[in-house]
Each structure stands twice: as C-alpha cells, then as structure tokens.
C-alpha cells in the first residue's frame, strides 16, 4: 500500500478555542502527527456563533503537545487581512519556539474573510493569485535574509524589511489549489500542494491537478514529485439527511461560495443547496472500509497526506484513529 499520512483537520467553527486546543492534544495521544486549524475571522455559517483567531490557538496547541505539527489551512497573505510580513513573523516566531513543528498553508482567499478588508471591493482571482505569489516571495526573503533588504513588488514595497526573530527550521509552505493554474503555481512557488476532494476527484487529480503541479515543479527545477495533501470530505449520513438536517452549514457547497461576502449570506445559501450538489461535494460511506478505499485510491496516484475533518469531536476522532489511522 502506498505511504500516506492521515492528518486531522480541526476546522475553525462549531467549538470554543480551548476545545480545539484540547482536540490537538487528544489527537497526538491517538497517534496523529499533524493537525490543521482553519483560519477565519467569520465562520461559514452565522448561527454557529464561533470563530477564533488561529494564531492564538496554534501557539497554545504547540505548547501543550510534544511532537504534533500544526498550521493554518489556510492563511491568506495577500495584503488585506494579513500582510505577508505579519505572516512571516507569526510563523517564524512559532517555529523559533517549537522548531520543526510549524506548517504554513496559504491560499488566495474567499470573500467571506477577506472582503471586509478591501473597503467593500473584492479583487478578481488573477490579482489575488498574483498577490499570493508575491507574498510568498516576501515571506521567504524575510525568513532567509540575514540583513535588512529593500523590496519592490507590484503589490508590496518598502525600503526596509527585516525579520529579527528567525525560524529555527525551514517552514514548509503549502499552496492551496483547486484548479489547474493554481496547481502549477503551487509547484513553482511552494513546497507542497494542498487541495480538497471530491471537488477534485480521482480522475481530475490524476489527469489535471497533479500533472500541472509537477509541471510547475519542473519549471522551478525542483527534484522529486513533491508533497500533496488533500482534504477528503466524508459523511456516513445520506445526502438527503444532510440537506434536511444540516442546511445551515451547506452554503460552502454553493458553486460561488468563495464570493459570498458574509456568514449570514452563506448560511442563507444553504437553503438553496441541492441534494445533487451535496452528493458531488462529499464522499458518502456506509462503512469505514469504503473511506479507506477512497484514501488508497488517492495514495496510488501520488497523494502523500489525507486530511480528515473531525472538528473537536472526540468520538469521531477516536473512530478515525481506530478505523483509518490504524490502516495506514
């Protein structure tokens, strides 16, 4: 069986911050080596009434665990909610205290969390991805440069940048990509690719996403196939049961969810999400062995890590450890 790491995705909604931290601690006790935290100022649905600051939780989770690697899935250093220099400092400070245990997932963002910081506007994807690429370049320069430097970019410029507290180890940058162009950019500019399924199903991953990612790595003269982490959305309910009982949380299934500006509007969109949309966005299983088979298929085409969303649900975490983690 191909080697693949099973990781936890704790998310950012549904629970209080201490519960997320405790979940990371419990995950380590269960044998997981990596836990991802969502990075939102607003949750995906309004009535959940929770959304905690990820960098606060990451620091406490690192202190309370011994070996667990943690990071944001994903942060958005495009100059709105976060300037790249702030992200560089935040990640470097954590790695300085907890070397080798910090991951940095980055992406181009969604309107839900970023639009309020653009004075009511929302840049097109092309601009956001340019900002992300330039932001990654600035972050790396701040980590690596031993002397102050001048930076003149299209979006970020200053005659003085210098990071005084450096990371102790190289911090992996994981680039979130849903489409072909972003996957290629992940190969060029980042250390690893992260994506979601079944939006990117086996066939699309094999024929579109992974070839584009590897082409990018080739263009950047990188060796090896590169790490690929994928979040597998799964459920043991039926699509009909989810639409009936969990409609408040379903706005993210909407095809334009990345452009919806606030959690009240996202939640309202959940009323209009169809059974077919839910079916296309989730791997539905009747037994754990079916989920294991899905993960095996992704591993065979080159996926190196699979992130499973559990939130801080200890019962679900135990079930994942017993039925999935133990297999791999």
Question: For each predicted feature, which ranges?
Answer:
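Active-site-adjacent structural elements that line small-molecule/cofactor binding pockets in enzymes
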Residues: 1-328
